[in-house]
């Protein structure tokens, strides 16, 4: 596995200050998202940043191989996550979902709360395929313009969606 530390350090800087004027994204570039927030757009953005900072700092300290460096996540995020389920229950839910029409499967994928363990799995360095690039709360709007640096397209971004939904967003949509 590549050394992810420089990438996380850059991500932490961009979370705090945005990209520098001459900075170019790595991978294949950026993918843009619209994050819809019914209320408290600035608060949603601040909450999402706080969780990502906790994960990045824990990873730089040796997580997940060093369990003592586990992310110190905000309690609101932990409380917002779904309780863990057994393997048997997960298999039963998966079989049920696969029996549904595709449109309903997609709706459930977008609306179902994630467990903390599932979310952390996708935030482990070996599973991360997206990194924060930039985000702006648009004036007089109820949404955030978000740019994410990606390695390839398509890429799994359910953990990104859950990060913002847990923070209070009503929807996260990739721009076409």
Task: List the model feature ranges, each with a label.
Residues 2-161, 165-169, 173-176:
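Structured alpha/beta or helical-core interaction and ligand-binding surfaces enriched in interleaved
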């Amino acid at each position: 596995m590549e050394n992810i530390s420089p990438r996380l350090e850059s991500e932490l800087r961009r979370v705090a200050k945005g990209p520098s004027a001459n900075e170019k994204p790595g991978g294949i570039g950026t993918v843009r998202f619209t994050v819809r927030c019914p209320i408290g757009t600035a608060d949603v953005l601040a909450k999402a940043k706080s969780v990502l900072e906790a994960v990045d700092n824990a990873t730089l300290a040796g997580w997940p191989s060093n369990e003592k460096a586990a992310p110190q996540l905000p309690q609101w995020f932990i409380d917002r996550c779904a309780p863990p389920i057994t393997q048997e229950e997960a298999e039963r839910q998966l079989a049920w979902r696969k029996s549904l029409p595709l449109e309903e499967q997609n709706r459930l994928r977008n609306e179902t709360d994630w467990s903390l363990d599932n979310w952390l799995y996708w935030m482990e360095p070996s599973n991360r395929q997206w990194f924060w690039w930039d985000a702006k709360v648009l004036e007089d709007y109820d949404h955030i313009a978000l740019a994410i640096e990606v390695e390839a397209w398509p890429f799994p971004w359910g953990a990104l969606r859950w990060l913002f939904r847990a923070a209070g967003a009503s929807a996260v949509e990739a721009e076409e």
